[in-house]
């Protein structure tokens, strides 16, 4: 059984070591299954991308990842994937918390595009529907500790709530 405490999360950038990056991540870029699960679009990488990669400690086999694209004023969550055998074990929760913690440390707003059904899963983590196009939504998460709506609250993870965010149709 794979448990979160048996795993490590690494931060990778292809520009640091392109050969090593694609030797490990290439199978995900080439996989039709990963493409289908990531909305039908191929994975992309670029100079502003950072990959949070989850694997068992001492093992090189990647169990999952979240990619983000950091710009001076916003972070875009791009792609997320977890192998089927690693699902339902709290691993994605651990990965998501690490990524959002990183975004909070940067003090930047965060945006992502996702299928409409996923909006309710991201609502408890500070994301709100910004716009809708077909079955996809753009979600925004304000920068923590820097926005006037936070009343000067300190930077940190968004507290989990039991309320589900409502989806707007703009």
Q: Which residues does each PLM region occupy?
A:
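C-terminal "cap" of GNAT-fold acetyltransferases
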Residues: 131-170
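Conserved acetyl-CoA-binding loop-helix of GNAT-fold acetyltransferases
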Residues: 88-101
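Active-site acidic-Proline motif in GNAT/NAT acetyltransferases
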Residues: 83-85
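Short amphipathic alpha-helix that is part of the acyltransferase structural core
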Residues: 1-38
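Conserved GNAT acetyl-CoA-binding A-motif
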Residues: 103-115
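Conserved active-site alpha-helix within GNAT-family acetyltransferase domains
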Residues: 115-134
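Active-site rim helix/loop that mediates acceptor-substrate recognition in acyltransferases
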Residues: 26-58
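Conserved beta-strand in the GNAT
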Residues: 53, 60-69, 74-81
